[in-house]
Regions:
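Short, surface-exposed ligand- or partner-binding patches at beta-edge/loop junctions that are enriched
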Residues: 62
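Rhodanese-like catalytic fold shared by cysteine-dependent sulfurtransferases
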Residues: 2-19, 26-58, 67-100
C-alpha cells in the first residue's frame, strides 16, 4: 500500500465512506458487533462476491481474532476486489476505532 494507513482507512469508515465487514457467525454477530458493521459469515463470503463488490470502499474485514478475516480478505482480493483490509479482531479494531 502506498502510504495508506489504518488511521486513514478508519477515518473513511467513520465518515460512512467505507464498509466494516464482520465475517464471524450470525450468532457471534448478534451477540456483539461494531456499530454499522455488515455480517457475512466467512463460509458465505465467496457466494456473496458480487454483493461485496458493490459495497463502499475501503472494506475493513474483521472477526474474533483476525484468522477468519485474513482468509476472507484473501478471498476478496483473489476475486479482484481492491481496497480490502484485514482489520483483525473485533476488540482490538473497536479500540482502534474509538481511539483514532
Amino acid at each position: 500500500e502506498t502510504g495508506i494507513t489504518m488511521q486513514n482507512i478508519i477515518k473513511s469508515i467513520k465518515e460512512k465512506k467505507g464498509t466494516l465487514l464482520d465475517v464471524r457467525s450470525k450468532i457471534e454477530f448478534e451477540e456483539n458487533h461494531i456499530a454499522g458493521a455488515i455480517n457475512i459469515p466467512l463460509d458465505m463470503v465467496e457466494v456473496n462476491i458480487k454483493n461485496i463488490e458493490t459495497m463502499p470502499k475501503p472494506i475493513v474485514v474483521y472477526c474474533l481474532s483476525g484468522g477468519r478475516s485474513g482468509i476472507a480478505t484473501d478471498i476478496l482480493q483473489q476475486n479482484g476486489i481492491e481496497d480490502v483490509y484485514n482489520g483483525g479482531g473485533i476488540f482490538s479494531l473497536n479500540n482502534f476505532i474509538n481511539n483514532n
